[in-house]
């Protein structure tokens, strides 16, 4: 299907809605314009005082566009996936954020002749929160242009809501088509200057650590990575700030008395220091910031549309850089801003009835500006990991994107479900939007090595970043040797890993590694059971 004008366009305001059939239409002082150029469809909106909520575009399939053969559909996620990415049949009510792929056949046997995959998407960093719906008669794009849970008041300016593209890829696998489509949607990737990998203390320490323990973690990482082409990172996760999962971010707590000194000591071991931060959180107003800087619906969190908040975020970021940290992992911003985790967001991103401090911008614009403020303050030499960031909005602004919900150092079920799924299904975005971070390998001794070793192995061979959270002193010599080999492989990230049975299995076991098929049996040892979503 080629990119073309929709058959029906509907404007939704706080006062009502109206449908149109042309490239332009107006409701009160609100107007939309659709422009075809260079195989893209630009959707723009303008209004003076009318609060705008949604723009809906509907394409009815012509007989030539309608797929006659059976197809399966892939839909992406707002931010991190929750172990729920999959190819499905036609589900008209399904919400597919950002883009959808529609394909015949299967990737399992790598047959290409007669394959046809269509992509329906928007370019990265749009001005609206966009999702697709696909049914037997057509395809629909919804653009949420609200400001929080109220209509945006543009004040006469023109909003570039989205640049829309349809693409068709023939005689290639669905995975290959997905890779090509992600590259076409991308406004440009911000690739790290070196492969990013190493240690992160979260999945064994869970916030209980210290200056000395981090130095020991860094020493172990340096020893295991000795001789590698690229130096590893040591990411200090939550637990260093005065309040757990909260600021202020201008100093450490009693267990972390000297954050600049800690960064210097990590670097002295030949390891790149990294730090975790939760910018938006200000529970109980511990950061000492003005009351007017907080979200109207929840005063425990900062409002990223406020100029003072953006300045505070820039200052905090510059402080980390001045302290000597070469990697910043910023976390939890989607749930802190919108009130729920990305993989639990249904059709609309925010509940009705509230708005940001600056009501003239859409939620998508406000969140993108928040990411951009961090990027500008971090500079070109600092690696940013966007954790729980909105995928399409952070693309091009961060080097790494955490693409799945948390694995778990204590539960193989959670690790397998969250980790393997996001690695398989978000791999096509790797190198197009950012480097895909499918999360860490948590080594605590609670999960048998037969299982956690599989997760370590596939991540190390994936060509995507490998981070390991390993409790010191629990590995045998043989296991340490495996970890050393995994780090060595991942320190260059030249491998090409492709899921094969991903169209039939949301936890793929068949993979293509550098052109050779390999298998992973994720269920070989029945060490735990998921029943009704809980481990028994």
List each model region and its residues.
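Short strand-loop junctions, especially beta-strand C-caps/beta-turns
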Residues: 202-204, 239, 446, 471
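Short coil/turn segments at secondary-structure boundaries
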Residues: 438, 470-475, 498-502
């Amino acid at each position: 299907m080629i990119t073309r004008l929709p058959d029906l366009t509907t404007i939704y305001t706080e006062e009502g809605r109206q449908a149109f059939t042309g490239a332009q239409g107006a409701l009160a002082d609100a107007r939309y314009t659709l422009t075809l150029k260079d195989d893209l469809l630009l959707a723009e909106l303008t209004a003076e005082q009318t609060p705008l909520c949604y723009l809906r575009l509907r394409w009815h399939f012509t007989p030539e566009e309608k797929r006659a053969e059976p197809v399966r559909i892939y839909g992406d996620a707002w931010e991190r996936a929750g172990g729920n990415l999959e190819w499905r049949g036609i589900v008209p009510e399904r919400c597919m954020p950002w883009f959808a792929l529609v394909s015949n056949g299967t990737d399992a046997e790598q047959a290409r002749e007669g394959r046809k995959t269509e992509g329906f998407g928007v370019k990265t960093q749009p001005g609206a929160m966009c999702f697709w719906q696909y049914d037997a008669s057509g395809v629909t794009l919804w653009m949420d242009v609200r400001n929080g849970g109220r209509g945006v008041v543009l004040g006469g300016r023109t909003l570039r809501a989205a640049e829309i593209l349809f693409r068709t890829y023939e005689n290639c696998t669905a995975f290959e088509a997905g890779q090509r489509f992600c590259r076409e949607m991308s406004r440009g990737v911000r690739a790290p200057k070196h492969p990013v990998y190493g240690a992160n203390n979260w999945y064994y320490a869970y916030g209980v650590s210290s200056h000395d323990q981090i130095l020991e973690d860094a020493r172990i990482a340096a020893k295991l990575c000795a001789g590698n082409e690229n130096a590893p990172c040591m990411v200090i996760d939550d637990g260093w700030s005065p309040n757990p999962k909260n600021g202020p971010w201008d100093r450490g707590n009693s267990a972390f008395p000297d954050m600049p000194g800690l960064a210097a000591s990590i670097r002295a071991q030949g390891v790149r220091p990294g730090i975790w931060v939760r910018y938006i959180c200000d529970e109980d107003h511990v950061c000492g910031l003005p009351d007017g800087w907080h979200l109207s619906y929840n005063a425990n969190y900062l409002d990223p549309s406020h100029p003072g908040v953006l300045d505070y975020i820039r200052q905090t970021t510059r402080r980390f850089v001045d302290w000597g940290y070469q990697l910043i992992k910023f976390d939890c911003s989607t749930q802190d801003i919108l009130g729920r985790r990305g993989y639990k967001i249904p059709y609309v991103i925010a509940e009705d009835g509230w708005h940001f401090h600056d009501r003239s911008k859409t939620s998508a614009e406000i969140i993108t500006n928040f990411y951009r403020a961090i990027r500008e303050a971090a500079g070109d030499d600092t690696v940013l990991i966007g954790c729980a960031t909105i995928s399409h909005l952070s693309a091009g602004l961060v080097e790494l994107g955490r693409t799945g919900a948390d694995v778990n150092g204590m539960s193989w079920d959670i690790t397998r479900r969250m980790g393997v799924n996001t690695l398989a299904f978000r791999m096509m975005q790797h190198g197009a939007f950012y480097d895909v971070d499918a999360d860490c390998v948590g080594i605590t001794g609670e999960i048998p090595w037969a299982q956690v070793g599989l997760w370590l192995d596939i991540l190390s061979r994936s060509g995507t970043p490998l981070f390991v959270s390993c409790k010191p002193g629990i590995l045998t010599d043989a296991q340490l040797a495996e970890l050393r080999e995994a780090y060595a492989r991942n320190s260059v990230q030249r491998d090409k890993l492709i899921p094969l049975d991903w169209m039939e299995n949301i936890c793929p076991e068949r993979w293509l590694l550098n052109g050779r098929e390999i298998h992973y049996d994720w269920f070989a040892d029945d060490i735990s059971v998921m029943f009704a979503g809980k481990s028994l």
